[in-house]
Amino acid sequence: MSLDLRIEQQQKSLWCWVAVSVSVKRFYTTATIHQCEQASSQNDGKPCCDDPDACNVKDGYLMAALQRLGVFRQLVEDSVPFELLAAEIAQKRPVCCRIEWRDRTGHFVCIDGYDGRALFVKDPWDGAFLRVPYDEFKTRYRGSGRWTHTYLTTP
């Protein structure tokens, strides 16, 4: 089962949170929100559309970004059971996840479907659609990523 969420590729190296939040909003509505506009809203109104490099900061918070766009429902500070993911997808709600790399930096992705126990992961880093076994996604996403937080969304 797949929701066919179209993930935007992040326009700056640290804008995974921007691309994920904008992609989820676009999944639920026809609203057009540019990544630089969303980045500006989280950077004290800096003109990110005029100078995106000045806004390429790592303190972007996905929860606040989803809240600002009206599509945030709940934060779980951990991974969640496969059955919860399946239930969210069945309700046509993509699930966002924070991945932590070995160097303790983070990255955000979206899950928009599954087949058996394999998850359909949309990654804004390169716009990739990846089919990743659930157990691998929890502890070894792209080799070394560990799933640390789950963001449930709502229309």
Please report, for each region that a protein language model flagged, where it lies by residue:
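Conserved active-site-adjacent core of cysteine acyl-enzyme catalytic domains
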Residues: L3-D4, K25, E37-P155
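N-terminal carbohydrate-binding/catalytic regions of secreted carbohydrate-active enzymes
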Residues: V20, V24, Y28
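A short glycine/serine-rich beta->alpha loop
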Residues: S2-Q11
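Long non-globular sequence segments
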Residues: R6, Y28-A31
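Short coil/loop linkers at secondary-structure junctions
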Residues: A31-T32, F72
